[in-house]
From Swiss-Prot:
Mg(2+) binds at residue 18. This is S-adenosylmethionine synthase. Coiled coil: none annotated. L-methionine binds at residues 57, 100, 260, 291. Its main location: cytoplasm. One of its GO terms (molecular function) is methionine adenosyltransferase activity. It is an enzyme of class 2 (transferase). It comes from Trichormus variabilis (strain ATCC 29413 / PCC 7937) (Anabaena variabilis). ATP binds at residues 16, 175-177, 251-252, 260, 266-267, 283, 287. Pfam families: S-AdoMet_synt_C (PF02773), S-AdoMet_synt_M (PF02772), S-AdoMet_synt_N (PF00438). One of its GO terms (biological process) is S-adenosylmethionine biosynthetic process. Belongs to the AdoMet synthase family. K(+) binds at residue 44. Homotetramer; dimer of dimers.
Length: 420
């Protein structure tokens, strides 16, 4: 008997208050790593009406102006008019930073494996920056090997920002949210149930002043300029049964930090798989690569994506866990949800033998300390909005499928050996 169900994921634009914070945090990280690739960074940002607070722990040789970094990023996002209650030029910026705790630093600088002389391997020298669990996921629903709902939500959010920035819909303002509900049948997406867009806008549009008329124009414009282009090249599209909701409160004039405070790390589901896969709870933005919340989550995605890209499973989830100050993962778990072409234990063995999952190894494999300087001073800030994963518009090392062919051959060899 077939099972039909709905699954929903959301995204937000770069002008959402929480995303402003994520982008400032990651711009700080980019700037510090560009000058000093060994910087230890845990940059947290809070925004509210007319206020930016930069706090956290940073140890670095770099010399930067944190207030200028924040203002430049705020202006780039689109907050340039003080009449909106928040702008790059008018906001106050408070900087309250400490250095990384020496108790934490000693475990990261010299991992337990090295301190206790259990290993002389290079990648055993750096310990994990904290304990924790991280998940990586991939599935074959989209070319990005990501779940369809989060891909669509991101596409709409990016298009929403694009038509604002180009002036195509000049009445739009930076804050916005999107949400897509996908119809599934027997585990495969078959339709679009609901598309929801909430977008900040001016109180009037040209000579249109009536609130209902303003909302009617916004709804029509968003369908034509945003939704239709997003779905234009896709097989699954909205149909006559699809609900299209726009600003369901009736208006969205007060937005950005004037409407809601923002905080770094508060959109972790938007940053990953839209709720389709499990999440360990750790945020990404503002954290240097020794923080396994970030680097190990990228590594787990890399593992899962290569397994799916190799055709060894239709979907794959990988869990990694770490202890602070210890280089090697405490545990590695893999689940293909019954879609694997071979037993999960065979895949797990291949992962353990062929993927480098120690923090120093992940940093080296993905070049995580040097990418900001190699890419003109910006890398992490570009993934701080519209998702860290499945970004075919960016060259991200954890999105590469360079181990897929090897995995296919290894499985074939393993099966042949078992038969022999």
């Amino acid at each position: 008997m077939s099972r039909r169900y709905l699954f929903t994921s959301e995204s937000v634009t770069e002008g959402h208050p929480d995303k402003i914070c994520d982008q400032i945090s990651d711009t700080i990280l980019d700037t510090l790593l560009t000058q000093d690739p060994t910087s230890r960074v845990a940059a947290e940002v809070v925004v509210n009406t007319g206020l930016v607070l930069i706090t956290g722990e940073i140890t670095t040789k770099a010399n930067v102006n944190y207030a200028n970094i924040a203002r430049q990023k705020i202006a780039e996002i689109g907050y340039t008019n003080a009449d909106n209650g928040f702008s790059a030029s008018s906001t106050s910026v408070i900087v309250a930073l400490d250095e990384q705790s020496p108790d934490i630093a000693q475990g990261v600088n010299t991992a337990q494996e090295t301190r206790e002389q259990d290993s002389e391997e290079l990648f055993d020298k750096i310990g994990a920056g904290d304990q924790g669990i991280m998940f990586g996921f991939a599935c074959n629903e989209t070319p990005e090997l990501m779940p369809l709902p989060i891909c669509l939500a991101h596409r709409i959010a990016r298009r929403l920002a694009a038509v604002r920035k180009t002036g195509e819909l000049s009445y739009l303002r930076p804050d916005g949210k999107t949400q897509v509900t996908v119809v599934y049948e027997d585990g495969r997406p078959v339709g679009i149930d609901t598309v929801l867009i909430s977008t900040q806008h001016t109180a009037t549009i040209g000579d249109i002043t009536d609130e209902a008329a303003v909302q009617a124009k916004i709804k029509q414009d968003l369908w034509t300029a945003v939704v239709e282009p997003v779905f234009g090249d896709l097989e699954i599209k909205p149909d006559q049964e699809t609900r299209f909701l726009v600003n369901p409160t009736g208006k969205f004039v007060i937005g950005g930090p004037q409407g809601d405070s923002g905080l770094t790390g508060r959109k972790i589901i938007v940053d990953t798989y839209g709720g389709y896969s499990r999440h360990g709870g750790g945020a990404f933005s503002g954290k240097d690569p020794t923080k396994v919340d970030r680097s190990a989550a990228y590594a787990a995605r890399y593992v899962a994506k290569n397994i799916v890209a190799a055709g060894l499973a239709e979907k794959c989830e990988v869990q990694l866990s770490y202890a602070i100050g210890v280089a090697r993962p405490v545990s590695i778990f893999l689940d293909t949800f019954g879609t694997g072409k071979v037993d999960d234990e065979i895949l797990l063995g291949l992962v353990k033998d062929n993927f480098e999952l120690r923090p120093a190894g992940i940093i080296h494999s993905f070049n995580l300390r040097n990418l900001p300087s190699e890419r003109g001073g910006r890398f992490y800030q570009d993934v701080a909005a519209y998702g860290h994963l499945g970004r075919n518009d960016l060259d991200l090392p954890w999105e590469r499928t360079d181990k897929a062919d090897f995995l296919k051959q290894a499985v074939t060899h393993s099966l042949s050996a078992a038969i022999a």
